């Protein structure tokens, strides 16, 4: 998400972060990666909020408050695409939809529609098929007592470090929507381009 904002905002700008539940370890990992990606850029995080219990509707008040303080915001990092939906709605009310870069994650159909409509910049997509294939491969290897390959990270659950294979999400934008989402069979062309004509 940070990489996409850096690419789309080369001159820098103010960034708002509206994340998921603060106690969710995934939120902490995404935050860490996002901040590392922004290092050395002219992008400045000026406002941060967390949607308790991943309640996306909380983003409405957070963004209204943030826009009062920072009306010239350039980009908004959203914890997921549900939060991004609320953010885009508020931006539309302020006549800013499509003018402020919005990034989210999950690859929801509605997010894909917003991307081709121009109100959301990108979604970080995690292929369920790939996750299932990798999980099945590891399950078979473990059942056979084989050494696990490609373990590239670990996480501490309080009792010790648990090794795991971290898969990288795919940045889906209007540039690769057809290739990743439609050709991949995740959402149909008719559904993604429901509200706008598809450019050939």
Explain the meaning of each model-derived region.
Residues 14, 99-101, 122:
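Proline-centered loop/turn at the N-terminus of a beta-strand
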Residues 1-15, 29, 57-60, 107-111, ...:
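Hydrophobic alpha-helical segments within soluble ligand-binding/sensing domains
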Residues 34, 47, 52-114:
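Hydrophobic alpha-helical
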Residues 20-22, 46-52, 72-74, 122, ...:
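Second-shell loop/turn segments in exported
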Residues 80-88, 116, 122, 126-144, ...:
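Extracellular/periplasmic ligand-binding modules, especially the Venus flytrap/periplasmic-binding
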Residues 14, 18-26, 36-38, 134, ...:
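Hinge/cleft segment of the Venus flytrap/periplasmic-binding protein
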